[in-house]
Amino acid sequence: MASTSLKERKYFATESFSVSSKYDKAIFDYFNKKNELRYGENPHQKGWFSGDLEKVFSQLHGKQVSYNNLLDIDAAIMLMQDFESSPPTFAILKHNNACGFASRSNLKEAYLAALEADPVSAFGGILISNIEIDLETASEINTLFCEVVIAPAFDKKALELLKSKKNRIILKQKNTYFPEKIERSCLNGILIKQRDLRTEEIKTFELKTVS
């Protein structure tokens, strides 16, 4: 009577569960309708989001968030996580990267310093604060064309002013837990890595070049 090795049995078990899990996922996807976005990365592509955005933020104003907006919002929130307990801090992002970042004694100064880093790239960018946005700061923000403004809270008058731009997306961020692992599709499979939770401190920096 033929027998199979432990290695072979593990292989067949893996294949069997792979098939059954795809069936279960197909049922889940049918009932868990995805949010259709305006378009994907480019206007000729379709795009969807599968998840619960309401756990992350409340949208207070503006048009529907786009595929690219969501990528930038994710990058902004992940960046600011390291500075939740810091002095007033402001960041400006474009294409998933920070083009301006600053911490100061008050939020207006933090915003202006972040903007000064690269005012050209800031145009049409994503703005995020680690504290409530006040009227003074909102008045400065309102002179810049930006896609999204994110903060844990907004002063009432500041919010009214920021809403004066019809399409500007205003998001009130919630205190949300994010998984320690990040997944992304790759070669018909999934890559998984631990989230980068290490914060570099300026005192550990070493000067390698002198101009």
List PLM regions with ranges.
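Internal, active-site/partner-interface "lid" segment
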Residues: M1-Y30
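ATP-dependent carboxylate/acyl-activation modules
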Residues: V19-S211
